[in-house]
Structure formats: structure tokens, C-alpha cells
Amino acid sequence: VPGRAAVGHHSGGLLCRRKLLGVFPHDHARSRAYRWGEDGLLGITNRQCRLCFALALWNEKDPILNERLFGLTGLEGNPGEDVKEEYFYLDSTPTHSYMKALYLYPQAAFPYTELTEENLRRGPSDPEYELADAGVFDENRYFSVLAEYAKADPEDLLIRFTVENHGPEPAVLHLLPTAWFRNTWSWGC
């Protein structure tokens, strides 16, 4: 239909639909400036959302740093937009004076392509293809990363990361705590 995006799952139609909806895939994320605190993995911001802090991880197997949650756009995921990671918000006070979250990071290379292609292949009535379905947690070969934030007073934030290797062998994990100022100067990036 002239002037409308293709509906099929072939790459040309997917690209057209992304442009119409103004969304971009995870692969573009590392080329775009962070805009908010929630852009980062297990991130937090100050009250004005000016100073942001988050964690980046690298297991020496992935081709890129793991600094943002991997997800599928509404056009890639068979149920619609969908994060394909294992993370859990465990605790928080109403004032956020204490917060705790858990993230599970595979020791194997993250299956970006497999998750995208398999979910594209499936229809809306099919079950989702999740990270665990790709076998990356087999034999408990993953790291658990526990993030805790606590306010010592209104202007003092304490941060603690506790990492545990659940696998049967030693494995390398690089932790990169990252602070940045929110991008307010260029909204088109």
C-alpha cells in the first residue's frame, strides 16, 4: 500500500515500520547519548535527573559492553515491545532512601541475534522466546549482580554492588560503574 509500511517480517519492512514509529533497535543504543538515569543498567539519578549513575558489565565474551537492558521493539517481539533480560526489583522504601535490585548476567555471549530472530519468527499466539530458552543459564553459568543504593542523608548516596559467580568454574567479569550528566542539549540523538 503506497505511503504505508510493509507488514511482513522481512528486514525491509521492519526498517520501514521502525521509521514510521520513531523507534530504534538495541543495536543503535550504544551510538546514542544517554538521556535519563533509567537508560543505564541498574541506574539511578539525582532528584533533578541531572546526574546519572549506572553499571556497565563485560564478560569478555560479548562483542559490546552490557550497559543497557536488551529488548525488542514492538515490531521485533512477537508479544510487542519486550525486555529480554533477567532483572528483579527486590526492595525499596517509599522515599527511595534504600533500593535493591538483582541482575543476572550470562557468562556466555549474550544471544542478541538469536533472541531477535526467533521472536520475529514466532507469531502473536506463540510463546515468547526468552533468555533462558537460549540456554545461557545452563549449569548455572551466570553472574548475579546485586545493586544496593542507600541515602546516608539527603545529599549523600551510598552504592554497593555484590557479585556472585554461580557457575562451576572461575569466570571473568568486568564491572564499570559509570556516572554521566543527562543529555539536555541534543534531543535528536
Language-model features: locations:
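Anionic coordination/interaction segments
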Residues: 1-189
